[in-house]
């Protein structure tokens, strides 16, 4: 079953029925997400074998079931109720068969899937009742049982307490339209049984009280191990034996009543006929290749199809609901398996060596933008490495803000006024902290690299601190810069050296701590958890998704060019490769989504544009999350199916978190609003501010670098200088999905109301929806 078939089945339904089907999909997908697997039939055993079509004159001829024809099969047994890992629970049992030609890759849909369960019939005749049952509590289900809308005999027939999977009979319950070789149609139902089993086993005795529950506790005194059914089946194959089944079918003429899967077809009138023999001989339960097979009753043969449904009230709706639910669930499950974590020792998110999830493939528009600027880094560097050509390329790059500030003076002479303004409003914002009990200065910016390793033979200060004196009437003044144990003041000869050294330390800190750790990798852990734990239809995911676009792709494809073994920072900085990663991990260990910028920033510093802008953006995000999600979707968020997914989201965040501070989050749904505000603030506002100022602040290596390159040979120096110039230009140039164009009407309105506070520091055209560069 593919997307076209899915849409065709869905579009045959009336609008109310489509809504109910979509809700069913969401319910089952949520169950699968909560169980970290399938929503039903979660734990099972997988085996391979073959199927041989039998000769029978009573079976109508068929293009798939041609006597003597042989096929490969992949087969699965499982307990029906998802999450019921104990085989000794009184539960329904299931089997699923995928049939393919000899040699087919059976991990993908092939000729036919059959999904069969214990019980000759299903307990609910229509998709509307199925939807009602799935969304009901115990008392409501009891009422359905009492009223007869939930068929008691069907519930009783499904529950089994067997000693082996092989002693049970399994039924499709659904009927299929069987088209014979003469193009005559009839309906068919299938069942599977052990040819050596004359009667079905595992039946319940009268002492078992049946209610609306689909699984009952194990019987008192039952000491069988929790996975005894799977172990028993596996042991049969381990001993060199085979497991045999016979596939049978009933046939009857085309009539609506036949499609009702809650009614038994009298075997005296519609006898069971042998169709095929199945031999299973190879356990594949430990083979990850087959673990995520998505069996679907909608994966049908062109001469064997489910009857069409036009309403959730017709009998055919149950079969169509199964096809739609299984298809949607497989997408959700497959999506989750594409978002794979590496070791907890890795940086958070998807390791770059894992394949990119299909849903993260960027748009053609973004790829066009990326290609537009890639020539700067990929193709324009002179292959001969000639110094004069490189100098010409570097000089030809656009002028930076620092170039304009320095003007025609000595390029190493950085004006104090410019230096001070960029500490307040440049590419490393929000780093100023109030000092305590110091004489002469009130605030400071500190970069401490003492515990990190420097490359052999090179030198870089362990400690660099810029000290400021803040007077609300007279403004901000530079007090001094401390480098290791030496304090250097503006009146000293070494003052320009001190400023350049500070800029080197800040350049490294901005890239590793703020830009990469706090924005890129920090937010990727939330993207991963959201994509893995929330179904695509979940209100939270639908709301936050525009703020997640592009991050995983850019982290996988472009970030290695910055911090990979041959990337810019490992070559340009004085730190070893290991220490570069350690700096980012250390920063990540301090980060929690239970944070806000208002409490973290200095107040009322003259000339500070960032603090009021950050405060204003945080305040508007409060309204954005409330008015865009929490209020309009209040009832939907409270439903069990959606609440379970949010709980799973927080559980995964807790499990994967690198936070090691003394005030960890609670990791529960009470913090959902804080989480969403935190993600959007970093994805949109903070990354936009820091990223688009990189070229102005650090684009010219004559003014700012990550270290002293005089110890390198000329070719290496040239390569670093060119890389810095071109890389910061590309990072600062690509604009994709600006809020002004792609934001929701609500977000645009809220930003316009704060534009007079935001725009002095960040032009609104530079405010993006997500981290995508």
Curated annotation (Swiss-Prot):
Give the EC number(s) under which this enzyme is classified: 1.13.11.61
Pathway(s) served = Lipid metabolism; oxylipin biosynthesis
Q: Which stretches are annotated as coiled coil?
A: none
Gene3D superfamilies membership: Catalase core domain (2.40.180.10), Lipoxygenase-1, Domain 5 (1.20.245.10)
Recorded catalytic activity of this chain's protein: (9Z,12Z,15Z)-octadecatrienoate + O2 = (9R,10E,12Z,15Z)-9-hydroperoxyoctadeca-10,12,15-trienoate
Q: What is this protein called?
A: Linolenate 9R-lipoxygenase
Question: What does this protein do, in the record's words?
Answer: Catalyzes the conversion of alpha-linoleate to (9R,10E,12Z,15Z)-9-hydroperoxyoctadeca-10,12,15-trienoate in oxylipin biosynthesis. Also converts alpha-linoleate to (9R,10E,12Z)-9-hydroperoxyoctadeca-10,12-dienoate.
Which residue positions does the secretion signal occupy? none
Q: Where does Fe cation bind?
A: 515, 520, 773
Please report the organism this UniProt entry assigns to the protein.
Answer: Nostoc sp. (strain PCC 7120 / SAG 25.82 / UTEX 2576)
**Keywords of this entry:** Fatty acid biosynthesis, Fatty acid metabolism, Iron, Lipid biosynthesis, Lipid metabolism, Metal-binding, Oxidoreductase, Oxylipin biosynthesis, Plasmid
Q: Does the keyword Cell membrane apply?
A: no
């Amino acid at each position: 079953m593919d997307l076209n078939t899915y849409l065709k089945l869905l579009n045959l339904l009336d609008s109310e029925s489509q809504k109910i089907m979509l809700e069913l999909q969401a319910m089952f997908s949520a169950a699968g997400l909560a169980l970290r697997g399938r929503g039903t039939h979660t734990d099972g055993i997988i085996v391979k074998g073959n199927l041989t079509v039998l000769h029978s004159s009573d079976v109508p001829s068929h293009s798939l079931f041609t006597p003597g024809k042989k096929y490969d099969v992949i087969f699965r047994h499982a307990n029906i109720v998802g999450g019921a890992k104990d085989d000794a629970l009184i539960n329904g049992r299931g089997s699923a068969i995928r049939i393919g030609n000899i040699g087919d890759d059976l991990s993908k849909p092939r000729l036919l899937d059959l999904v069969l369960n214990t019980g000759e019939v299903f307990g609910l005749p229509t998709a509307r009742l199925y939807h009602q049952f799935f969304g009901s509590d115990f008392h409501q289900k009891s009422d359905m049982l009492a009223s007869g809308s939930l068929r008691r005999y069907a519930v009783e027939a499904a529950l089994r307490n067997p000693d082996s999977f092989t002693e049970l009979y399994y039924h499709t319950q659904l009927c299929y339209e069987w088209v014979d070789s003469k193009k005559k149609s009839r309906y068919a139902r299938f069942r599977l049984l052990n040819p050596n089993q004359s009667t079905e086993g595992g039946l319940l005795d009268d002492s078992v009280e049946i209610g609306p529950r689909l699984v009952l506790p194990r019987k008192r005194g039952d000491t069988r191990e929790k996975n005894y059914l799977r172990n028993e089946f596996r042991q049969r194959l381990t001993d060199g034996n085979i497991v045999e089944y016979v596939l049978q079918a009933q046939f009857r003429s085309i009539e609506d009543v036949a499609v009702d899967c809650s009614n038994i077809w009298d075997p005296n009138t519609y006898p069971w006929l042998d169709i095929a023999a199945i031999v299973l001989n190879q356990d594949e339960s430990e083979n990850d290749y087959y673990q995520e097979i998505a069996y679907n009753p909608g994966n049908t043969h062109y001469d064997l199809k489910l009857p069409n449904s036009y309403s959730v009230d017709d009998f055919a709706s149950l079969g169509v609901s199964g096809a739609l639910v299984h298809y949607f669930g497989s997408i959700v499950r497959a999506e989750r398996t594409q978002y794979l974590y590496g070791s907890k020792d890795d940086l958070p998110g998807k390791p770059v060596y894992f394949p990119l999830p299909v849903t993260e493939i960027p748009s053609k528009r973004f790829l066009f933008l990326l290609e537009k600027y890639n020539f700067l880094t990929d193709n324009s560097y002179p292959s001969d490495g000639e110094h004069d050509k490189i100098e010409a390329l570097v000089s030809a790059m656009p002028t930076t803000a620092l170039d304009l500030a320095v003007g025609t003076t000595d390029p190493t002479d950085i004006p104090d006024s410019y230096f001070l303004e960029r500490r307040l409003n440049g590419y490393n914002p929000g780093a100023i902290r109030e000092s305590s009990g110091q004489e002469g200065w009130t605030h400071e910016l500190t970069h401490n690299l003492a515990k990190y390793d420097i490359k052999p033979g090179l030198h870089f200060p362990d400690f660099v601190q810029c000290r400021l004196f803040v007077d609300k009437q007279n403004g901000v003044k530079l007090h001094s810069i401390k480098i290791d144990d030496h304090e250097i003041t503006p009146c000293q000869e070494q003052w320009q050296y001190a400023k350049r050294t500070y800029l080197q330390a800040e350049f490294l800190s901005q890239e590793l701590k703020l830009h990469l750790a706090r924005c890129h990798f920090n937010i990727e852990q939330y993207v991963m958890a959201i994509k893995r734990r929330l179904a695509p239809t979940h209100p939270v995911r639908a709301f936050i998704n525009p703020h997640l676009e592009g991050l995983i792709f850019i982290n996988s494809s472009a970030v290695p060019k910055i911090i990979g073994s041959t990337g810019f920072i490992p070559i340009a900085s004085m730190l070893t490769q290991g220490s570069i990663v350690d700096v980012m991990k250390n920063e990540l260990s301090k980060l929690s989504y239970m944070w806000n910028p208002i409490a973290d920033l200095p107040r009322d510093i003259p000339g500070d544009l960032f603090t009021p802008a950050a405060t204003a953006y945080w305040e508007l995000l409060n309204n954005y999350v409330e008015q865009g999600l929490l209020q309009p979707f209040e009832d939907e968020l409270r439903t069990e199916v959606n609440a379970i997914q949010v709980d799973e989201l927080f559980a995964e965040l807790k499990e994967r978190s690198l936070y090691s501070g003394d005030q960890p989050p609670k990791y529960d749904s009470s913090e959902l609003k804080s989480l969403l505000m935190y993600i959007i603030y970093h994805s949109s506002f903070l990354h936009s501010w820091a990223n688009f100022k990189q070229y102005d602040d650090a684009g010219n290596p004559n003014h700012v670098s990550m270290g002293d390159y005089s110890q390198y040979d000329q070719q290496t120096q040239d390569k670093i200088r060119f890389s810095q110039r071109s890389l910061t230009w590309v990072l600062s140039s690509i604009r994709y999905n600006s809020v002004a164009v792609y934001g929701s009407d609500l977000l645009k309105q809220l930003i316009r109301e704060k534009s007079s506070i935001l725009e002095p520091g960040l032009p609104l055209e530079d405010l993006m929806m997500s981290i995508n560069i």
